[in-house]
C-alpha cells in the first residue's frame, strides 16, 4: 500500500465559508439537529467568567480508534504549546475503565456518546460541562466521525482556537459538516480515503506543528497483573465477537483453530461481552472440553487486558480488543473484512509492530463501508470475512507462536 507523506495540508477557510443567512437557517439538516439547536446555543453562549486555559481533545471513538490515535497525543503538548497536565481528553464511556492507565498524565472525561446524540437533557448537561471547561484550544482529528457528536462538542466549547481534520463527507452529512466546519479556525486535510488512521493522526500533528512526526504503532504500558489462567502454561485468547454481526468470522472456524491449539497442549479462553455469545450452543459445547474457558461476559475491560497481556496468542475479529492486544505487544492475528479496508486494518508498514498479523480475502466489492448487498440479512457474516479459510488462519497462528515463545507460551508440541 502506498503511504502518503506525513505532512498534511491546511484547507483554506474561504472554501468552507457560508452566508450568515444560511448559517442562521441551514438547509438539509435533520429534524434532530433542529430540536437540539436552541439548547446547543444556550450551552455555547453560557457565560464563563474565568480565563481560558489548556487544550480540549475531542475523541468520540470506539476502543480501537482510540488506540490508533493514542501515540500521536504525545506530541500535542509541544504542537499546541500547552502543558501536558492542561490537556483534557473528552472520550467515550466504553473505554473509561482503562483510561487512567492509557492516558496517564492527562485529564480524561468520558461520556455516553450515543446518549449525547439522542437524549436532549443528557446532551445539554454534557454541553454545559464542556463549556465550563473553558479551553483555550479545542482539537479533533477524527476522520470517520459524526457531526452531531464530535463537531458539536468542538463548537459548544467555543474555544479561542479550534483545529479539526477534514472528515469523510457524503451527501447526507454535507450540510451538517458544512455548518460546523465553516466556524472553526483551521481545517487540516489528512489525506483521501482510505488513508490509514495512524497516518492521519500523525499528519494532523505534523501539519499543525509545521514539521514531520513519524507514525508510531499503538503501544500500552500496562501494569503486569498476572491472571490466574497464566499459572498453568500457555494459553490463547479467542475474541470471536463484534458489535457488527457481519464481521464475526464463523464460530465453527474459530472452533477448528481452537481444536488445533488444544491438540498442542495449549489452553483456550473465549472472551467477549455477554451479548456476543452469538453461537451459544457451540460455545457451551466447547466450554465443556478440558482446557477451554468460556469467559464471555465474565471479565471487565482491565481484566481482559491482563488476559491478553500474558497470552501466547490472541485471535480476534476486527474490533476494539484486537487493537488493545496489538498495543500490549501480544502476538495477535486479526481477521479482516473489506468494509473500509486499510483505513483501520491492516496497519501500514511504517506503523505495524512485529507482533501483529492481518489475514483477509481480497474481493472486488471491498470498500463497501459495510453496506454489503451479498447477504440475505444483516445478521449473516460478510462474505469477505466468511471466505477466509480456517487452515490459512492456522498457518499464520503457527508462524506467530513459533516467533513468540514467551514465558507464557514456552512448551510447544509439534503441530
Question: Where do the language-model regions lie?
Answer:
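Catalytic machinery of carbohydrate-active enzymes
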Residues: 1-415
